């Protein structure tokens, strides 16, 4: 997919119990213009099983030892092509429709600056 609007990096390590909810929250945004990248730090729990379950929705995923969350995010950044890049910790999730709202704001030519948390 060339130049998607959103790139979402999901760093993960032994968080399989949260990972499925996180991935579903991204997939259920119903946005086609998105790439999902999962960087797993070599988990020993069920994380890889969860990742494989959603593999068809992912642009890229890897499960290998890393040096922590910052390293995972940097690995994910190297795979991103989106105009807007976000990382979503695997124990967090997106509210329904949140990416649609962000996309609408960024496409509004009357808005010069937007800040949120």
Question: Predicted segment positions?
Answer:
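Nucleotide-sugar donor-binding/catalytic module of glycosyltransferases
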Residues: 1-117
């Amino acid at each position: 997919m060339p130049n998607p609007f959103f790139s979402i990096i999901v760093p993960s390590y032994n968080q399989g119990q949260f990972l499925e909810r996180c991935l579903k929250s991204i997939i259920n945004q119903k946005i086609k213009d998105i790439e999902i990248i999962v960087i797993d730090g070599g988990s020993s729990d069920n994380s890889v099983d969860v990742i494989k379950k959603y593999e068809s929705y992912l642009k890229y995923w890897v499960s290998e030892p890393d040096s922590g969350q910052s390293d995972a995010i940097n690995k994910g950044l190297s795979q991103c092509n989106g105009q807007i890049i976000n990382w979503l910790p695997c124990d967090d999730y997106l509210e329904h429709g949140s990416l649609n709202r962000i996309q609408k704001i960024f496409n509004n030519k009357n808005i010069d600056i937007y800040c949120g948390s």
